[in-house]
């Protein structure tokens, strides 16, 4: 049996560009892709913290060091510049892989600077 597991996440990224008349995708600073283990053309899910929108697209490489998060094409209608979003990549894993797996979690501040990375999400208390 295989399970679909979170592999990489960019948490609270700020949208820097929304380009409606561009081939669909999400342009992401290559440094962010590397940190989260996401590769160009990989399927990603995006969750908009500001309005609750959830949608899928694919990642494309953005200029390294630019701190860019650009929603392109139809995705540009799902968020505004300045919105906080979560970008996730998932992948199938066997039970043996699941037992060893730790996702690559990248946390960003309001200026899209990486403030920390982790491989664990803290236990949520009641």
From Swiss-Prot:
Residues at the active site: 25 (schiff-base intermediate with substrate), 58 (proton donor)
Sorted keywords for this record are:
Autocatalytic cleavage, Cytoplasm, Decarboxylase, Lyase, Pantothenate biosynthesis, Pyruvate, Schiff base, Zymogen
| Modification after translation (UniProt) | Is synthesized initially as an inactive proenzyme, which is activated by self-cleavage at a specific serine bond to produce a beta-subunit with a hydroxyl group at its C-terminus and an alpha-subunit with a pyruvoyl group at its N-terminus.
Subcellular localization, as worded in the UniProt entry: Cytoplasm
Q: What is its EC class? A: lyase
Q: Which residues carry this modification: Pyruvic acid (Ser)?
A: 25
Q: Tell me its cofactors.
A: pyruvate
Q: Which GO terms describe its cellular component?
A: cytosol
Question: Per the annotation, how and in what number is the cofactor bound?
Answer: Binds 1 pyruvoyl group covalently per subunit.
Its subunit composition reads: Heterooctamer of four alpha and four beta subunits.
Q: Which family does it belong to?
A: Belongs to the PanD family.
Q: What is this protein called?
A: Aspartate 1-decarboxylase
Source organism: Tolumonas auensis (strain DSM 9187 / NBRC 110442 / TA 4)
Name of encoding gene: panD
